Amino acid sequence: MVKHWRLILLLALVPLLLSGCGKPFLSTLKPAGEVADKQYDLTVLSTLIMVVVVAVVSVIFFYVIVRFRRSRVGENTIPKQVEGNKFLEITWTVIPILLLIILVIPVVLYTLELADTSPMDKKGRKAEDALVVNVRANLYWWEFEYPDYGIITSQELIVPTDQRVYFNLKASDVKHSFWIPSVGGKLDTNTDNENKFFLTFDSKRSKEAGDMFFGKCAELCGPSHALMDFKVKTMSAKEFQGWTKEMKNYKSTAESDLAKQGEELFKEKNCLSCHAVEPNDKRAEAARTAPNLATFGERTKVAGVKEANKENVKAWLKDPDSIKPGNKMTGTYPKLSDSETNALYEYLKGLKAESK
């Protein structure tokens, strides 16, 4: 019997240990913006209400068990019945209603406030007043378009802090779900309609997070659903304006001889039919079937999941399916030799927005 209790105790500790796993600032319990703060407050409020209810019911439950135990009242004693007691009937009807009212009022108020995306649809809207980002989810990558600036990026969302950023969400293939746990809870991306919402990124808490947050797909979409990650880089409004100017003036140029070989291979293998290498991609959405590779050389991840070192980039180029199963890149080009992947790596790592 003692062994069974030890096993039960051990199993009970497993969830506690697992709760400590995960990445920094990939948790709803570390809110870093206006939306996340409100959602966290509602979580705390609802949890407190439930804790109070469970505590009161548990106290009454154990009191009855102890007070009317057989050894104390005897075999044939029947406790006083309270059926039809008006005071008790009113009490256990009114209290739940009051608790629901306490919970419903902030939920409704916050829902209406967080659903207000009218500033993004105003005529004459300026990006400085209401920045809009079009998010397009694909199997298994993300595209971010800044329509006010004519900029398109992939896998890394760049946003200013301390202001509302408005999002148009849609999907190009199947249903996905856009989620940045630390900044605001998720919203689906659909193929047949657009969803809209806004998020804010608090500058102080962004600094604490190293100006970096992590986003995920929160809707099961295929074999690499768990690998459909993206990164969010935050910066001040002034720095953001500087970034947009850099991106507008961005030109992809290969410098070394090996990089130039990689550029020629990139064209020869017809990579440009799917990938763009500059952020001002004018093609229609239907033609943008693969991630935009502008600033690839500044990214810390390849395919959103592996460290962007030479070994991993070459492994991705040789066999994408070994890193992200089900991706659409696999089998679209002939097998590459080591010399070809070396040249392509050199070219791709040179794609940067930084001044050259």
Curated annotation (Swiss-Prot):
Extracellular side: 21-47, 107-356
Bilayer disposition of the protein: Multi-pass membrane protein
Domain of life where this protein originates: Bacteria
Cellular localization per UniProt: Cell membrane
Covalent lipid adducts (S-diacylglycerol cysteine), residues: 21
A Pfam entry, by short name: COX2
InterPro entries xref list: CcO_II, CcO_II-like_C, Copper_CuA, Cupredoxin, CuRO_CcO_Caa3_II, Cyt_c-like_dom, Cyt_c-like_dom_sf, Cyt_c_oxidase_su2
Sequence positions that bind heme c: 271, 274-275, 329
One Gene Ontology CC term in the entry: plasma membrane
Enzyme Commission number(s) of this protein: 7.1.1.9
All ranges on the Cytoplasmic side of the membrane: 67-87
Biological role stated in the UniProt entry: Subunits I and II form the functional core of the enzyme complex. Electrons originating in cytochrome c are transferred via heme a and Cu(A) to the binuclear center formed by heme a3 and Cu(B).
Lipidation, N-palmitoyl cysteine type: 21
Key words of the record: Cell membrane, Copper, Electron transport, Heme, Iron, Lipoprotein, Membrane, Metal-binding, Palmitate, Respiratory chain, Signal, Translocase, Transmembrane, Transmembrane helix, Transport
Cofactor note (record): Binds a copper A center.
Amino-acid positions noted as binding Cu cation in the UniProt annotation, renumbered to this chain: 176, 217, 221, 225
Record-given protein name: Cytochrome c oxidase subunit 2
Claim: Membrane is one of the keywords in the record: yes
Main subcellular localisation: membrane
Transmembrane domains' residue ranges: 48-66, 88-106
Source species of the chain: Bacillus subtilis (strain 168)
Chain residue ranges for the region called Cytochrome c oxidase subunit II: 21-257
GO molecular function: copper ion binding; cytochrome-c oxidase activity; heme binding
Cytochrome c domain mapped to chain residues: 258-356
Cofactor(s) it depends on: Cu cation; heme c
